Amino acid sequence: MPKPVVAIVGRPNVGKSTLFNRIVGNRVAIVEGEPGVTRDRLYQDAEWSGRSFTLVDTGGLDFKESDEIIQGVRRQAEIAIREADAVLLVVDAKAGLNPGDEEVASIIRRAEKPALLVANKVEKFDSLEQIYDFYRLGLGDPLPVSAAEGLNTGDLLDRLVEMLPPEKEDEYPPEAIKIAVIGRPNVGKSSLVNLILGEERVIVSNVPGTTRDAIDTPFEANGRHYVIIDTAGMRRKSRIDRPTEKYGVIRALRAIDRSDVVLVVLDAVEGVTDQDKRIAGYAHEAGKASVIVVNKWDLVEKDGHTMNRYTEKIREELAFMHYSPLLFTSAATGKRVGKIMELVDMVAGRHSMRISTPGLNALIREAVLRTPPPSDKGRRLKITYAVQGGIKPPKFVLFVNAPDLMHFSYLRYLENQIRAAFGFEGTPIRFVLRKKTKEA
């Protein structure tokens, strides 16, 4: 089920990023030391009162070009508001009403999206004259908060979850494998989808972002049900210019949330970009199975070592996705495109694979004997038992004497041992540590 998307919009320096960090800061688990994932905190999942949503911070997208402030705010807000399910308009109560605030508010009113007006930087809640001018924005009662101090943010979240659309399930058969095709504009996503489907169901043009929107295409192959979620409409050339291209991420987030398998499509000529890392990182953190598809391979000049060099470079840039199979393709020539669905089936199977508890514990014992767990000041970590606690992605619960002694590098070692013994290619693996209690 896709999470609703909430966009935080407003002119620069009103506290958007502070509010973003306040909402997600204590509700997002980030593994210390995990390499490679780009964490610019542009977007993050959050939860309140049992409702999950994806929060998007426009603070990192303020224009650094020579554009006027209001022009920059307009472009950011139009994209964020169009793609979001709900909007938080943040204004600066200290600075008072500003033409930039009025500009964003007018866009929200025209879009008819659920919106909450957040008057930030309110220090004294017994004297609120400073927020009265914001009623002129036509978005209802301004909610006074202090994002820096956390004041009234609980009330803000209560009102926000009331605005979110009702939860609903996808209408496809439960056994259908949902495949998200993600990547930057013009990397060849639609052409690859057309070849997979064997027919022209998706509009294709050489102009980035010509697909009208994210398109679901159910189909059957070899007796199995699939749904391809094509996000080729990440950017509309007539509406969005290059500085705001990052907002294609919002559609990718939705597609990833709904998917079982993610095809991360890269441009072989341009290589891995920051946006590629962001979107791939979200797929990894969401626990999805994945295949890295390097398209336009026909445009690369090659010698006998080219593929090895490219593989090494991509593995370095997307180190957090080290488990994903890598496929070099050309939608223009059809080379290796036929292998995509083979890999989809394979990684989907690994994503939902279970291994026996005796087999898992035997492997853990051997791994511990080969390389003992870390210790600290005479205390040594002991792993007494292990069990697989879930699938999609595979999750392993380790019962230990002292969870605080576990180091990320040792978990990576155990992950490598599990992968070597059982496979799990194409899927992330999660670990949960449980303290072993002494029996009475």
Swiss-Prot record:
Membrane-crossing residues?
A: none
InterPro entries in the record, alphabetically? AAA+_ATPase, G_ENGA, GTP-bd, GTPase_Der, KH_dom-like, KH_dom-like_a/b, P-loop_NTPase, Small_GTP-bd
Lineage top rank: taxon: Bacteria
Give all residue intervals belonging to the KH-like domain. Answer: 353-437
Q: Which residues bind GTP 2?
A: 183-190, 230-234, 295-298
**Which residues make up the binding site for GTP 1?**
10-17, 57-61, 120-123
**GO biological process entries:** ribosome biogenesis
User: What would be one Pfam family of this protein?
Assistant: KH_dom-like
Give an example GO molecular function.
Answer: ribosome binding
UniProt keyword list? GTP-binding, Nucleotide-binding, Repeat, Ribosome biogenesis
Q: Which residues form the EngA-type G domain?
A: 4-168, 177-352
Alphabetized CDD domains for the sequence: EngA1, EngA2
Tell me which positions the record assigns to the signal sequence.
none
The entry assigns this protein to a family as follows:
Belongs to the TRAFAC class TrmE-Era-EngA-EngB-Septin-like GTPase superfamily. EngA (Der) GTPase family.
Subunit info here reads: Associates with the 50S ribosomal subunit.
Q: What role does this protein play?
A: GTPase that plays an essential role in the late steps of ribosome biogenesis.
> Which PANTHER family does the UniProt entry name for this protein?
GTPASE DER (PTHR43834:SF6)
Record's protein name? GTPase Der
